[in-house]
Design a protein with these regions (language model features):
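Short acidic/glycine-rich loops and adjacent helix/strand connectors
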Residues: 2-290
Length: 290
């Protein structure tokens, strides 16, 4: 009986925080690790060179043994709206086309610089690279790893290629996205803006703000102010009032405008780091210390 060939997929995430690599065999994840676990460079954005090596060593395979490589971002979409005024930012997305292949060539046995000849030969051939739309990758990660055969899917983050929120349906082995919200309306940017306003690093320290939100503090007054800056829309999604947010204006040093700061009559209404630390200590003492 002829044994069917297994399907080996190398998954990659890089260019954003927490560069990661993983291996799936016949649709089941068998290995995965963030780059920071190996290099101790916390939340690194560098290409996950060491993570890829770890995963390949774990299954005792070479890169050439993989059937394909998947990257959770499709940089081709960013070429559609190229803006030369902000080329430093725009080309970052497009460069995925080159950085993935360029970095992975280090794993293939070759005699530099004969990369083109190697690519054309049957031996030591680079596996095909698939660039998956970012929010579709999020949806697949949620649905295909769930126990459901059919489910409604909602994905939200700062941004994908242009999408910030997606609504869809997953059924069996297919996902259909039927509604999206695009920049500048973004829940991720909304949360990052308040993270920065509180004195933390946007795109990095949101988890700290999320943890602090669980503290037993009356935030009713702040909640009413926040609701002035974000509105629900008739399609079940939302819109940000752009007079408060400027995260998509790339030459501005802050994500928020003066109008958002002035929404708070006193700047002291925004908890200082000292106040937050005291809240943390009190929460720990009251709930965990004995």
């Amino acid at each position: 009986i002829k044994q069917l060939k297994v399907l080996i997929v190398l998954g990659l995430n890089h260019g954003e925080i927490n560069s990661t690599a993983s291996i799936s065999i016949d649709g089941k994840i068998v290995c995965g690790t963030p780059e920071e676990r190996i290099t101790r460079n916390k939340k690194t954005k560098l290409f996950p060179q060491n993570a890829v090596k770890f995963c390949l060593d774990f299954i005792d395979k070479k890169l050439e043994d993989c059937d394909c490589i998947a990257q959770g971002w499709n940089p081709g979409e960013n070429w559609q709206k190229y803006n030369p005024l902000f080329s430093t930012y725009r080309t970052k997305r497009e460069d995925y086309f080159y950085t993935v292949a360029d970095n992975l060539y280090n794993f293939v046995d070759r005699s530099p610089p004969e990369w083109v000849l190697m690519q054309q030969s049957e031996k030591n051939k680079m596996p095909p690279i698939y660039f998956v739309r970012h929010h579709l990758a999020h949806a697949a990660n949620a649905f295909f790893l769930s126990p459901f055969k059919e489910a409604a899917i909602l994905t939200c983050d700062w941004r994908g290629e242009f999408q910030t929120t997606s609504l869809g349906i997953g059924k069996e082995n297919k996902i259909e996205i039927f509604s999206t919200k695009e920049l500048p309306h973004s829940l991720g940017m909304f949360y990052a803006t308040y993270t920065q306003l509180l004195g933390y690093r946007d795109g990095y320290d949101e988890w700290k703000v999320m943890a602090l939100s669980a503290f037993d503090v009356d935030c009713t007054e702040h909640l009413e102010k926040i609701r002035k800056t974000i509105k629900l829309t008739s399609d079940g999604l939302f819109e940000l009032d752009q007079s408060y947010y400027q995260g998509v204006i790339l030459d501005k040093p802050k994500l928020y405008t003066d109008k958002l700061v002035n929404l708070y009559t006193k700047l002291t209404e925004i908890p200082s780091k000292t106040t937050i630390i005291k809240l943390q200590l009190n929460f720990f003492i009251n709930n965990f210390a004995s």
